[in-house]
Curated annotation (Swiss-Prot):
It is found in: Cytoplasm. It catalyses: 7-phospho-2-dehydro-3-deoxy-D-arabino-heptonate = 3-dehydroquinate + phosphate. It comes from Nostoc punctiforme (strain ATCC 29133 / PCC 73102). Its cofactor is Co(2+); Zn(2+); NAD(+). Zn(2+) binds at E186, H251, H268. The lineage of its organism: Bacteria, Bacillati, Cyanobacteriota, Cyanophyceae, Nostocales. Belongs to the sugar phosphate cyclases superfamily. Dehydroquinate synthase family. It is an enzyme of class 4 (lyase). Gene3D superfamilies: 3.40.50.1970, Dehydroquinate synthase-like - alpha domain. This is 3-dehydroquinate synthase. NAD(+) binds at G107, V108, I109, G110, D111, T131, T132, K144, K153. Its EC number is 4.2.3.4. The keyword Lipoprotein does not apply.
Length: 363
């Protein structure tokens, strides 16, 4: 069964297409959009080995001319050096403004490909084909693209909406357990910030820590409800003027933890899980959220096999300093997304640093 979710935007709306074996439909789906014939497929070596030829076959059978480029996996390679490599391949293959870059991979590949597409010739088409749960439910949707700076995550970037997000749930079968858990952090996030029914669904499930224990119908529901939540928020606030900021729940402290551990010790989903635990406790300390609700959230995070404690050796003062480099800082004040009930959050910059410090010391 195919699920189609519309991301309705003033300048360029697009579809999120979710269906088994969808990867084989990539070429036809792109042909339906009447995109130019030149395509640059971007992936990492592991994903390319699993799915690259299938994607290329689908594209070529629909009449596209395909070049490919593989980039090293991992957040620490999400930098301008990798973007330069993409530019070089684009130049070698004479990618014109009608061309399309296709991101086949997780969040790192999606972010870099999107940024390269946003900046090559001042903007060419990009199609997102996410292969991790995290990218499927979050980073592939909404047009945020970017790379890291040595002093902070995603400090260099642009908004550049895809022409299509194509999701094939079957590719999750080759996803390592740790990466599946990382994606579940973003799914839990949607339950806390937007969709109390999704949260209840997750609570009712016995095991969430490995894909093989999660029923296929729950995977379908997770993908559809999470993508719908992201589409709803982005449709109301494309460029983070207000509402879209709620998608950063768990990301403020999470990004600081990622950056301070060199993007090696914890992955993005694990960092977001830690950030959600911290944000939930901050909300409790400020009298905004019930203690039992933060306990429900934390129990769900633990059931998924995600961390709820800071990594050992991470300096709390360094985290507080790193928060000031977060791109969400406004007039020197750190903005936090804090829950008020399951399914509802608020954004505030009125969080005293001593509360942040106290919560982090308790983790």
């Amino acid at each position: 069964m195919t699920s189609l979710i519309n991301v309705n935007l003033p300048e360029q709306s697009y579809e999120i297409a979710i269906a088994p074996s969808n990867l084989d439909q990539l070429g036809q789906q792109m042909a339906n959009l009447k995109l130019g014939k030149k395509v640059l497929l971007v992936s990492n070596p592991t994903i390319f080995k699993h799915y690259g030829e299938r994607a290329i076959t689908s594209l070529k059978s629909a009449g596209f001319e395909v070049a490919s480029c593989t980039l090293p996996p991992g957040e620490r390679y999400k930098n301008l050096n990798s973007i330069q490599k993409l530019y070089d391949v684009a130049l070698e293959n004479r990618l014109e403004r009608s061309a399309t870059m296709v991101a086949l991979g997780g969040g790192v590949i999606g972010d870099m490909t999107g940024f390269a597409a946003a900046t090559w010739l001042r903007g060419i088409n990009v199609v997102q084909v996410p292969t991790t749960l995290l990218a499927m439910v979050d980073s592939a949707i909404g047009g945020k693209t970017g790379v890291n700076h040595p002093h902070g995550k995603n400090l260099i970037g642009a908004f550049h909406q895809p022409r299509l997000v194509l999701i094939d749930p079957d590719v999750l079968k080759t996803l390592p357990m740790r990466e599946f858990r990382a994606g579940m952090a973003e799914v839990i996030k949607y339950g806390v910030i937007w969709d109390a029914e999704l949260f209840a669904q997750l609570e009712a499930s016995k095991r969430l820590d490995q894909l093989r224990y999660v029923k296929p119908e729950l995977i379908d529901s997770i993908l559809t409800r999470s993508c719908q939540a992201k589409a709803d928020v982005v449709g109301k606030d494309e460029k983070e003027g207000g509402l879209r900021a709620i998608l950063n729940y768990g990301h403020t402290i999470g990004h600081a933890v990622e950056s301070l551990t060199g993007y090696r010790l914890v992955n993005h989903g694990e960092a977001v899980a830690i950030g959600m635990v911290a944000a939930g406790q901050i909300a409790v300390e400020l009298g905004m959220w019930q203690k039992e609700d933060t306990e429900r959230q934390n129990a769900l995070i633990q059931k998924t096999g995600l961390p709820t404690q800071l990594p050992s050796g991470v300096d709390i003062e360094a985290i507080i300093d790193a928060l000031q480099l977060d791109k969400k800082v406004k007039a020197g004040k750190v903005r936090f997304v804090l829950p008020t009930e399951i399914g509802v959050v608020t954004v505030t910059d009125e969080v005293p640093s001593d509360i942040i410090r106290q919560v982090l010391q308790g983790m």
